Amino acid sequence: MAHITRFEAPWFLMISKKQYKWTVRPNAGPHSIEKSIPLAVVIRDYLKLAGTIREAKHIIFDGKVLVDGKVRKDYKYPVGLMDIVSIPSADLYFRVLPDNVRFMRFSKISADEARYKYVRIINKTTIKEGRIQLNLEDGRNILVDKETAKNFKTLMTLKIELPSQQILDSFTISERSYAIFVGGRNVGIHGIVKNINLSKFKSRKYSVITLESRDGNTYQTNIMNVMSIGREKSDLRVD
């Protein structure tokens, strides 16, 4: 199905549900339909670079739009959290950040900042010749040797260079680390991790994280909703 009704679209899409009956349906890709925005909608409704979907398509088909450092000519390409959207010809660069009101927002960044992406490890897989594959949240995979793989654990955040995927740094969810909520009712809240309540009878994914925001308020959520983005301070701009 190429389109969906606007009433069936994810609640956070910044589109008028009264203006038109249909909207673009994201293609299958690195993000689920429920947590992504079609590239044409990004260009028209979020970045305001086009007045219609047709105009947005022209911009995309001309190869002017990059997602994570690669030209994307699919107007239904799914854009999700922490993706980098670039229009170099217009000197425009954006990072998709979690937002407490609209779930996702496009934060303007510099061309230098657009060279880096932050993404969580969802699991590790052993492949041929004993090498380890790090499977990341946005669908990409990175191969490392067994010794290097010992440094990386599930739910760690990797800072990678685009589009080479070279690992530049990594961040663990630990007390005093800096994190941001990427899911749950407090999505978008960020601050210092104050406590990690590990489940005694269940796996680590049931752990509860307590975070203190910059205004001194504390929030709790499941560890699956948390992304580490720094050690004692954020490694990226989140405001």
Swiss-Prot record:
The species this protein was found in: Saccharolobus solfataricus (strain ATCC 35092 / DSM 1617 / JCM 11322 / P2) (Sulfolobus solfataricus)
InterPro entries named among the record's database cross-references: Rib_uL2_dom2 (IPR014722), Ribosomal_eS4 (IPR000876), Ribosomal_eS4_central_region (IPR013845), Ribosomal_eS4_central_sf (IPR038237), Ribosomal_eS4_KOW (IPR041982), Ribosomal_eS4_N (IPR013843), S4_RNA-bd (IPR002942), S4_RNA-bd_sf (IPR036986)
Signal peptide: none
Keywords: Ribonucleoprotein, Ribosomal protein, RNA-binding, rRNA-binding
Residue ranges constituting the S4 RNA-binding domain according to the UniProt record: 37-99
Chain's gene name: rps4e
Organism ancestry: Archaea, Thermoproteota, Thermoprotei, Sulfolobales, Sulfolobaceae
UniProt key word Ribonucleoprotein: yes
GO CC list: cytosolic small ribosomal subunit
GO biological process: one example: translation
Entries under NCBIfam families matching the protein: PRK04313.1
Protein name: Small ribosomal subunit protein eS4
Family (UniProt): Belongs to the eukaryotic ribosomal protein eS4 family.
GO MF terms, alphabetically ordered: RNA binding; rRNA binding; structural constituent of ribosome
